[in-house]
Amino acid sequence: MTSEIMTTEKVAEGDEIFFVGLLPQYYNTRRNEPVTRFGRLALSPKEKIASPEGPIDLLFAECQSFPGNSGSPVFLQFGPIRQAGTIVVGGDRLMLLGIMKGYFYQRGKVNIHPVTTLELAFQENIGIAAITPVQKLHEILFSEGLVQQRESAN
């Protein structure tokens, strides 16, 4: 999905998204089965987001993402038709929005007081996931260096 499609389709905060990823706490003996998580686009920032890697392009989604979900494709779902126990998705109304990058968490400390003060640090997932937009993936895949590398391999 390009910026033009996002504008044409009026993609905005509140639009439904979903992704499929692993749930590390659940695994089977014969095969690992992915879980599907649903949410909504929460913010499409107009500027880059500060990160340890430097400023990056991100989209924010209101959904739970945990370790094991990074790299999962995230889809934008226009107007799902729900039927008992199923979700029917219209063919051209499903678009790749990006790739799951991670999640945001709240840092905090807990003081325990009876006789001794013990300070425990914790990180709590706040329910906002970070998505690398598909436009960024397109830029990387079709960068001059990678195009030349693919051409020289042929």
Enumerate the predicted regions with their spans.
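A structural micro-motif recognizing beta-strand termini
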Residues: M1-T7, A61-P67
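Catalytic nucleophile loop of clan PA
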Residues: C63-I99, V110
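PDZ/PDZ-like groove recognition
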Residues: K109-N154
